[in-house]
Regions:
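Long compositionally biased, domain-poor regions of proteins
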Residues: 5-203
């Protein structure tokens, strides 16, 4: 049995995002004031300008004909996760993710899933691996994914009928957020900007 990722590189301890940061961001995103909306627009603009490869990858997913709940979830989680990294590490420590790094992470995710699918007796899957690497981020993501999958009533609908959310669309959004999380995690520099530790280099 193995718990850590076989294909996914470990996230350095200095790149862990705290749960409290995400809680603060969630509260700020719930603010519907004009000032808060302006700040949100600025955050999306910074994401696009500082992480063009990542923002394009997320946009490709969100530009699909997705279920409206999955679409809203994707916009919310993508900006919340990116803001968490920005606020935690700042522009000096958070490097731009290159096209090569993005492609390598996508391949690592696919390979990790294939390796674990080939060992059906393994109790840990991709979700578990990423949760170990970024526990605060993944707990936040899972909370909102689970909430999105709950059946809900249409506004103004009579009889209490509920609408099922498209689980495949939600899963596509979730996968894009996992990719975003891992790419940003490996883009973080240590406090002193030194070369990453031997644990990551040997992974």
């Amino acid at each position: 049995m193995w718990v850590r990722g076989a294909a996914i590189r470990p996230v350095p301890r200095y790149a862990i995002v705290g749960a409290s940061t995400l809680e603060q961001i969630e509260r700020s995103l719930a603010d519907e004031s004009a000032e808060a909306r302006a700040e949100l627009d600025g955050a999306f603009a910074r994401f696009e300008s500082t992480q063009p490869e990542l923002s394009d990858a997320i946009s490709q997913v969100l530009s699909r004909p997705l279920d409206e709940t999955a679409l809203a979830l994707g916009y919310f989680l993508s900006i919340a996760v990116w803001l968490a990294f920005e606020r935690t590490f700042g522009s000096e420590r958070l490097r731009q993710v290159t096209a090569d790094a993005l492609a390598a992470t996508e391949e690592a995710i696919k390979l990790e899933e294939e390796l674990r699918a080939a060992h059906g007796d393994e109790p840990f899957d991709l979700d578990d691996v990423v949760s170990i690497e970024q526990p605060g981020v993944l707990a936040f993501v899972h909370e909102h994914v689970d909430a999105a999958l709950e059946p809900r009533s249409h506004e103004g609908e009579v009889g209490g009928e509920t609408r099922e959310v498209d689980a495949d669309d939600v899963h596509a959004v979730y996968r894009s957020i996992v990719l975003l999380t891992l790419c940003l995690s490996h883009a973080v520099l240590p406090v002193d900007g030194a070369t990453r530790g031997s644990r990551e280099l040997m992974a």
